Amino acid sequence: MGELEEKETPPTETTAAQQEALEEPKETDKMLDKKEDAKEKTPSPQTSKPASPNAGKKSSPVAEKKIDDAELAKSKSGNGEEIIDIPAENGTKPDSADDKKISKEEREVKPKKIPIGGLKLPGFFMKNKPKADGDGAEGELLEKEKEEDKDKEANGDAATGSGKDEQKSRPGLGERLRSFFARKPSAEKEKKQLVNGDADAKSEATAEATPAEDASDAPPKRGLLNAIKLPIANMIPKKKSNDDVELGLGKAGLASMETLDDSLKDQDTVDRAPVKTNGTEELKGELKDEKLAAEEKLAAEEEEQNRPVSLLTRLRGYKCSVDDALIVFGILLFVLLLGVIGYVLTHETLTSPPLREGRYIMAVTGCGPVEGVKEDGAFAFRGIPYAKPPVDRLRWKPAELIDDINMCWNDTLQTHNSSVVCTQRLGNGTTVGDEDCLYLDVVTPHVRYNNPLPVVVLIGAESLAGPSPGILRPSARYSRSHDVIFVRPNFRLGVFGFLALDALTKEAHPPTSGNYALTDIIAVLNWIKLNIVHFGGDPQSVTLLGHRAGATLVTLLVNSQKVKGLYTRAWASSGSAILPGKPLSESGKQNEQLMATLECADIQCLREASSERLWAATPDTWLHFPVDLPQPQEANASGSRHEWLVLDGDVVFEHPSDTWKREQANDKPVLVMGATAHEAHTEKLRELHANWTREEVRAYLENSQIGALGLTDEVIEKYNASSYASLVSIISDIRSVCPLLTNARQQPSVPFYVVTQGEGPDQLATVDADVQAILGRYEPHTVEQRRFVSAMQQLFYYYVSHGTVQSFVQNRRVINVGQDAQPEEDYLPCNYWISKDIVPRYARVD
């Protein structure tokens, strides 16, 4: 502890009785004074003090109390200061006259010096005596903070007042519990409170330093918090500051819990004794100022803490740790993921144009915007022009895409209704349609640019002269349910779509004629490549679906170099097995019969002829081909039969069979071929007999080429021909099923299917059964028929989406589609007809 500055104080005279009543100095003080004497060889007159003759005697508690009361009354100076006399060292020599003179003039109390860092064990040298007796030093120091206690002591009521104050200041159980859970000040605040004389700490120290007024009163109890804090504070001592050392407030150590109170008493009696000097007023003033400043600061801090703080201020002052940052980052990431998922699931980007009046929608083409209409949950655009009208000079010219801005439109073209079909001949001999017919229909479930859908191009015609499109019309309901886009184009038919003449060949560059309908379909594929994306379609997934005469055109296009990159796969249903094999020159000579009938010498005359005159001049043998049993006259006229399709040298270079020979096996076939088991059925044939019996079937076979070849009995036995269904099955195998299977066998990767599931009273699988099931127009009435529809749709739409046929196996290439799709090694009846040279000789020709 640092040594306080020495200041002069007025001498205080003490009587012998008072000196005798004072308690002898403690053993610790004696030891410290002896060390000082050893250090200073000549004692200073300022520090010496006459010893009491009765210093060595032990005083009683009663005498101590009396002396204390008398001394307290005399020791108060004019200014109210308390002067505490410290007894001198044990000595027996009486004071001399010189000593008294020095005491009167220069007498002052010098504080005892304790070396800094010295060990102070207050309880080690204590005498064993009961606490009730008290210590003589306890009565020497009084409370300096409380003015009320000073006034009471001056009036003689110190004992009574101190007892009441002690009783009042003792906290109750509730207050102690509340203080236990209150926020504890920091170490720095505790240090400042100790320096400035905190009220709680001083009250405890004063209570210990004040002598017991009444021997019968029990010692004051410490609070629960102090009882806990004191052992912990002494077990883990904190570093003392220089102020603690200089003021004498520090403790050297703790000997035991029993000596804790004595340590505090020694601290008060020894360390605070020098406060008697004249600098006490200044020191007390400074301490009070510091105390007031500390109290004001503490009050300001409490007020600052109690002041309501905004959330933003709290967030700014918050110091987050690494764990807090990771938690916040995880929460933000989770919220972000939820937002992204919600955005993807609920948000619809404006990829589709809005509806007008709730049913009209607009799309864009290369020639201008078009407006479609909503139907059955899908959108239909009907009558979109895809090529220039093939009229006047463009009659018998290859189709040309619209590249002239003068042929386009400025406003939105309303494509709500179907356009007129191309001119054609119906089955009853009437003609319908118009030459300006190169339009197409688009049916799409969505008009959007994201998630493009596969495209199915419907090419249907019962014959190359018409009617078209026949049964092959797009279904809005199935477009929506299967997520595909249907495109159905018009294409030229009859003489307008297939006429090949030498005169036409000579004026064309490159020199070619005929197959104009094929160029129409090629133009459609080019239009799809450029525009289908605006209708929600995928130009990289285009499937050609041909039915009957349309299947024949599809088969030719698959083998043409003109369509490479314009389609992805093809499906041909009930097409013709007789494909063009005649050269262009030979076909041109055969078609000169038309010019002779029209009495035209040049092409200009033909272009000026009306469509009605041209249809009237068309030979009947060009329009109709018998779908019946082969007749004997066909054997001699097979080479002279008319064929609409030719080897034009532009679209069709060679016979498809020559192309198939060069093909290699492919896991994903580009063509699927198929037919129905009873596609030769006609109402005209059925009405020949009301009830077809075995005899009637035999008679009908005998009158055909089969009877001429003597195969009637074999055929009846093989087919069990005793009904109309068996007769139709024989005709279908000869004309269509077996010839198509023969073509499929020439292609290593082409699956072939046969529909055998029947309907109606005769259980016939008619020519349109497969296409009706694909487009949703087949009306099932039994469980077997419903399963057939499901199997047929699964075959087709899986192929459209993935490019493979589920039931196709390389060594079992024939798929028998009954109520289920079953792969088989072969279709047995065909081998018989092939062996008899009937197939493919008498195959149907379109």
Curated annotation (Swiss-Prot):
Q: Where are the stretches annotated Disordered?
A: 1-222
Residue pairs linked by disulfide bridges in the UniProt entry: 422-437, 600-605, 738-830
Chain ranges sitting on the Cytoplasmic side read: 1-324
Regarding the membrane, this protein is recorded as: Single-pass type II membrane protein
Tissue distribution is: Late in embryogenesis, expression is restricted to cells of the peripheral and central nervous system undergoing proliferation and differentiation. Also expressed in larval CNS, mesoderm and imaginal disks.
Question: Where is this gene product found?
Answer: Membrane
What Pfam families does its record include?
COesterase
For the Extracellular compartment, the record's topological domain ranges are 347-846
Identify residues that carry Phosphoserine: 44, 48, 52, 75, 77, 103, 169, 186, 203, 256, 263
Task: Report biased composition (Low complexity) as residue ranges.
Answer: 11-20
List, in alphabetical order, the GO biological process terms annotated in this UniProt record.
axon guidance; axonal fasciculation; axonogenesis; central nervous system development; heterophilic cell-cell adhesion via plasma membrane cell adhesion molecules
Any one GO CC term of this protein is: axon
GO terms assigned for molecular function = cell adhesion receptor activity
Entry similarity comment = In the C-terminal section; belongs to the type-B carboxylesterase/lipase family.
According to UniProt, the name of this protein is Neurotactin
Species the sequence originates in: Drosophila melanogaster (Fruit fly)
The root-end lineage is: Eukaryota, Metazoa, Ecdysozoa, Arthropoda, Hexapoda
* Gene name linked to the record: Nrt
